[in-house]
Amino acid sequence: MKQNKYEIDMCNGTIMDKLISFSLPLMLSGILQLMFNAVDIIVVGRFSGSQALAAVGSTTALINVFTNLFIGISLGANVLAARFYAAGKDLEMSDTVHTAVTLALVSGIVMAFVGLIFSRWALELMGTPDDVIGQSALYMKIYFLGMPFFMLYNYGAAILRAVGDTKRPLIFLVISGVVNAVLNLILVIMFHMDVAGVAIATVISQLISCILVLRCLCTSKTSYQLHFGKLRINTVYLKQIFQVGIPAGIQSTVINLSNALLQSSVNSFGSTAMAGYTAANNIFGFLYVAVNSVTQACMSFTSQNYGVHKFKRMDKVLVDCLIISVVTSFSLGCGAYFFGSEILKIYTADPEVIRCGLEILSYTTVPYFLCGIMDLFPGALRGMGHSGVPMILSVIGTVGTRIVWIFGIFPHHRSLAVLFISYPASWMLTIIMQVTCFYFVRRKVHRV
């Protein structure tokens, strides 16, 4: 199949260089998405104070809980589209695209209503302090108004990734990211809108990225061209999207529930610790983007090669992804550890907030490469269409360990250090289970 200048041929030629070409724009795209939240945090931390910083930061885990089920389902669309595109099945590819975009629109509207109705209740359930809950609820409600744009962008970008195009989503996010940063400065510094201002800026930037990705799909002149008149759900392909996407979404949602539980434990230390965790958690986000971009590459490459029955090439994809992920995440983790104080000063000038952030970083950044290894094997399995068992193992290993830690160990040794040691402990246990699962599934594929 003829490739356009943005696409990558995942099924032929060398692998390592193509993985890097695929992953690097995806990594930069993820960083830009994080910059939406990072700019929010930096601007409110510098110009609106520690309470506003804590208010914005305390919403992160909750927003992820609400949205990650549907974002996980977009992985199902990515896997199915990659498989059809590699096999040259144009009609099936078109039906998948229109089903995915329709699903994104519906889920975005549903999430907007859910966020507007349940934001404050969920924040109260997490024990958000009275001095920040009003601002937190306001930020969440405005943020969720932009959920249809957020969903449409993510599902559209998933289709582009399926055909090997990670460059145009990066361009779209550069444009919307610049708009976000400029609007933050205008609305917060000039108009003193505080958390409402940064939320409005984020929604507008999401609208712009949504328009750009939809325009790209509508003008593509390929099997993945989008026609608004054809928007409808094909139940056959919706079922296949759900088979891969729902377990991935449930896994992400449940893991973020455990993070929300951890956030509630941090809340018990007060707004200073909350602000420190907010800044540290944003740094975690940048580390996760590095490992997640490689996982996305592994899933897309595996799916296309699985679609054309190049099983030995799938193994080489996994090995090369492991090398890239470990080297990248270990290097970045060490950088975050050794330069943690300087990085945290970008977010806040409060020395107590910086101290709390450093305590959290000291136990989580260097071993972050374990998180990368933990995510790669489920990514490869999803690329082969196996999503249920990896989801169960991730929930048991990651969430189970953290729940036992929070309720069994933390109450007897109340400190941020003890709380966050649960991260590397859960990663190690999950790796053991996921590698074992991959070994048995891969043996079955080899026999096919």
Where are these regions (language model features)?
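Short alpha-helical transmembrane segments in multi-pass integral membrane proteins
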Residues: M1-S23, A81-G146, M190-I246, T302-P367, ...
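Residue-level signal for short hydrophobic patches within transmembrane helices
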Residues: N12, M16-M35, V39, L62-L69, ...
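Transmembrane helical elements of multi-pass membrane transporters/channels
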Residues: S21-D40, I142, S176, S205-S209, ...
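Hydrophobic alpha-helical transmembrane segments in multi-pass membrane proteins
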Residues: F22, L26-L34, I71, L103-A112, ...
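Helix-terminus/linker motif at the lipid-water interface of multi-pass membrane proteins
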Residues: M35-A54, L123-D130, I186-M193, T253-F286, ...
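Small-residue-rich hydrophobic transmembrane alpha-helices
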Residues: L53-F113, F150-P169, G276-C334, F338-G340, ...
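Hydrophobic transmembrane alpha-helices of multi-pass small-molecule transporters
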Residues: V65-N68, N180-L185, C210-L214, F286-V289, ...
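Short runs within selected transmembrane alpha-helices of multi-pass transporters and secretion channels
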Residues: S74, Y143-R161, P169-N180, V198-V213, ...
